[in-house]
């Protein structure tokens, strides 16, 4: 039985998900690794496939920004769809070798994975003639869109588990008028543990594709600490030989250390200050290019990062680590968005802003 590496990822920005897929596809085409299966969640995002019609996006750019939903045109097949928290997105990177080069059969097998998964919850889902995806009556519960390059697959499925279905009002799902959307939670009338659904999906995938799934842990476990004074955020500038970019405080979790302990340690080591560190309820996964780690790890380098915040008076002296950084600065959120390079940093700062707005709303009503 062929092996397939299973990556159980956290929240992955859409851009980072595309970069990771591209890297894995290229490596699989060169036969530098075995088949891969990525299971993850995306932040709120609307994507338009190669065969899609932009008219199926019903919201203006201003409306999308107000909802904190991004929009991308992508390389997969299919029309328009929504990804967001509470969805299990699956990206199989498989080599369809001799005897398996049947695109229709491949899509049918993906559909079967989803049909059998929701059946575990007593939900009867079906294929629908002339429609993409998996359906419960007239409501879509899962979307499918794939890409195949040199007989290596990418993209895949999005299964609605505990998804905020209100965001689907921003689009005409898959360009189909008169149809609705649903989720496992909606069908059952209760939320469902995401890890439980992931486990079932992986088992059904292994069964249908006849693969031995081999769990692959992340290469690095990190923390990110967003230091702020309420209105501005602190960024550190990495030295040219260390990447030459602006970033929040970031550090590796040492053996025997909890993420919170790492966050507190990094705050002291990177700024010379102590402060109250709070978790922001977000863990992200992303790929790190080997040049930023001096090729210490074999590709692909996949990291997970737990997000924290810390309040610091901007008048306090900041003592940076000269081995890593050559400058620092306090910036408004708008200025920080212009300076940071990585989409996961942007997602982190948006989460901090949302937490600040929520705290302000509580103070206003009490």
Residue ranges and their predicted role:
Residues 41, 160, 227, 307-311:
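Short, well-ordered beta-strand micro-motif
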